[in-house]
Curated annotation (Swiss-Prot):
The keyword Metal-binding applies. A motif (Galactose-binding) lies at residues 119-121. It comes from Bothrops insularis. Its main location: secreted. It comes from the Eukaryota. PANTHER family: MANNOSE, PHOSPHOLIPASE, LECTIN RECEPTOR RELATED. This is C-type lectin BiL.
Length: 158
């Protein structure tokens, strides 16, 4: 009987340690999702400066890219919980060629888009970088002048 209890307790410890792991190596205050970690930074930066900040934070980091509709609600909730300001939030999508051919800075496939109504519009032929719109609960996107200053969302693999 004592051996049974000892083995059962040992299996319980192993199970609890494995169930808590989930392959999540994200630091505190980062959102783990689909094998990546996401963090909102409230410091206001131009789009290129935000991308450079993410890259310098850790090799392989970039402004965030999204590939599934299902990611939007979780990201939006995380930003609403942790973003201290009211600004829009830069993500890693941009129109490098200025011809409505949108690309992610991490060079991943542009297979999902979530534009706000009447967007993108390249307003006055000046908007080539993409932000999450605060008025939509950070669920929809707008193209914006890249030199505008926004908070930003980095994604990293730890």
């Amino acid at each position: 009987m004592g051996r049974f209890i000892f083995v059962s307790f040992g299996l319980l410890v192993v199970f609890l340690s494995l169930s808590g792991a989930k392959g999540n190596n994200c630091p505190q205050d980062w959102l783990p999702m689909n094998g990546l970690c996401y963090k909102i930074f409230d410091e206001l930066k131009a789009w290129k400066d935000a991308e450079m900040f993410c890259r310098k934070y850790k090799p392989g980091c970039h402004l965030a890219s999204f590939h599934l509709y299902g990611e939007s609600p979780e990201i939006a909730e995380y930003i609403s919980d942790y973003h201290k300001g009211q600004s829009e939030v830069w993500i890693g999508l941009w129109d490098k060629k200025k011809d409505f051919s949108w690309e992610w800075t991490d060079r991943s496939c542009t297979d999902y888009l979530s534009w706000d109504k009447n967007q993108p519009d390249h307003y006055q032929n000046k908007e080539f970088c993409v932000e999450l719109v605060s008025d939509t609960g950070y669920r929809l996107w707008n193209d914006q002048v890249c030199e505008s200053k926004n908070a930003f969302l980095c994604q990293c693999k730890f």
